[in-house]
């Protein structure tokens, strides 16, 4: 995303044989500033990924104990591990989308076909969607913490972060 913006602006100026204008420089400075916010958010989510996944799974299983009861979709250590792995993969691809500012990496490499896979395995997509929403709540809370991050209004970025989780929940639910 950032490289494309810089390349486009420089190419346009070069094709006209001009220096970059003050407006163009200001716009590029804003891209860098916004990029720092994205990096802060991704770093926070990544640093807390294990807790986000574990706590979301714990809350899901408290709400839906049938999942971990004998015969449940997360019963046995192997199935539980698969559940946690899938939640971690979804979270990882959400961070890629946040960094890129684009959901296509999330869609193309993670979500496309995931619902069908879960249906074929008999995994309740609605339960996975609840788990994703719980990860969203935790990740947004962590990303919204104003301590130690780039200052400025992050409401649009936080809304974007939430939208990637909503997209993932809708894809599996």
Curated annotation (Swiss-Prot):
It holds the Pfam family Phycobilisome. Keywords: Antenna complex, Bile pigment, Chromophore, Electron transport, Membrane, Methylation, Photosynthesis, Phycobilisome, Thylakoid, Transport. InterPro entries: Globin-like_sf, Phycobilisome_asu/bsu, Phycobilisome_asu/bsu_sf, Phycocyanin_b. The keyword Electron transport applies. SUPFAM superfamilies: Globin-like (SSF46458). It is a peripheral membrane protein. One of its GO terms (cellular component) is phycobilisome. Light-harvesting photosynthetic bile pigment-protein from the phycobiliprotein complex (phycobilisome, PBS). Phycocyanin is the major phycobiliprotein in the PBS rod. Belongs to the phycobiliprotein family. Heterodimer of an alpha and a beta subunit. Part of 2 PBS rod complexes, the conventional PBS rod and a photosystem I-specific CpcL-PBS rod. This is C-phycocyanin beta subunit.
């Amino acid at each position: 995303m950032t490289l494309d913006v810089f390349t486009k602006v420089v190419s346009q100026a070069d094709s006209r044989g001009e220096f970059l204008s003050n407006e163009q420089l200001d716009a590029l400075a804003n891209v860098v500033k916004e990029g720092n916010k994205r990096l802060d958010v991704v770093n926070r989510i990544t640093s807390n990924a294990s807790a986000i996944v574990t706590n979301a799974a714990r809350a899901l299983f408290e709400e839906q104990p049938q999942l971990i009861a004998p015969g449940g979709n997360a019963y046995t250590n192997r199935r539980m591990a698969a559940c946690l792995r899938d939640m971690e993969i979804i979270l990882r691809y959400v961070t890629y989308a946040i960094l890129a500012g684009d959901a296509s990496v999330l869609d193309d490499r993670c979500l496309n076909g995931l619902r069908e896979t879960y249906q074929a395995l008999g995994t309740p997509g609605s339960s996975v969607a609840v788990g994703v929403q719980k990860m969203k709540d935790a990740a947004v809370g962590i990303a919204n913490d104003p301590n130690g991050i780039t200052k400025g209004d992050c409401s649009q970025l936080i809304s974007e972060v939430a939208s990637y989780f909503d997209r993932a929940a809708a894809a599996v639910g």
